[in-house]
């Protein structure tokens, strides 16, 4: 962790007070499984927290920066920014993958550069930063790493199928869209998810993905295309 601490200080001016917290953020579930450590020792809880912090900061930035855009447009922009591919790229740009503690099996299967793993790592780091130093530092970090790409429009042109589906269905009148994870398969370090999207209780489509977010996006895409099957 000393090399990581040095990198964070040199690149972002960050010095973690709680090194164990930082270590947890960079601990994959495959590592804790192989080492027979408690599940709470991996980064999944921090990922949950970081996901919320990231969404809040991005939402606040978009709201203040684009006063002319409607809610639907802002939602579409935010979804494009926080999607799996985008967050994985942010994680790569920070060089985080090098410091991730992985199990040997996951390492051999290329887990260190798997997009969902890097996405989760980026969110876990934000969660750890929030606990260690508060929301202001999280905001500063996101402004340094993420916001420049938003200003360059790098991540706001990607199709967000969930928002697109909502817009299509709303044309036909009142609608209640919901998503449900139908199935989880595979070991903890290499999960696959099957999601379904419903409108007013009627299933419209299913999707398969390596994360719940990806599976839901795929379900929405299949619903738009009229494909009521897993793909």
Swiss-Prot record:
Q: Give the enzyme's EC designation.
A: 3.1.26.3
**Protein name (database record):** Ribonuclease 3
Signal sequence interval, chain numbering: none
Instruction: Offer one example of a GO biological process linked to this entry.
Output: mRNA processing
Chain segments annotated as coiled-coil in the UniProt record: none
**Similarity field:** Belongs to the ribonuclease III family.
User: Per its database record, what is this protein's job?
Assistant: Digests double-stranded RNA. Involved in the processing of primary rRNA transcript to yield the immediate precursors to the large and small rRNAs (23S and 16S). Processes some mRNAs, and tRNAs when they are encoded in the rRNA operon. Processes pre-crRNA and tracrRNA of type II CRISPR loci if present in the organism.
Query: What class does this enzyme belong to in the EC scheme?
Result: hydrolase
Q: Which SMART domains match?
A: DSRM (SM00358), RIBOc (SM00535)
Q: Which UniProt keywords apply?
A: Cytoplasm, Endonuclease, Hydrolase, Magnesium, Metal-binding, mRNA processing, Nuclease, RNA-binding, rRNA processing, rRNA-binding, tRNA processing
What does the record give under GO molecular function?
Answer: double-stranded RNA binding; metal ion binding; ribonuclease III activity; rRNA binding
- State the organism of origin: Lactococcus lactis subsp. lactis (strain IL1403)
Cofactor(s) named in the record:
Mg(2+)
The organism's taxonomy opens as:
Bacteria, Bacillati, Bacillota, Bacilli, Lactobacillales
InterPro entries (alphabetical): dsRBD_dom, RNase_III, RNase_III_dom, RNase_III_sf
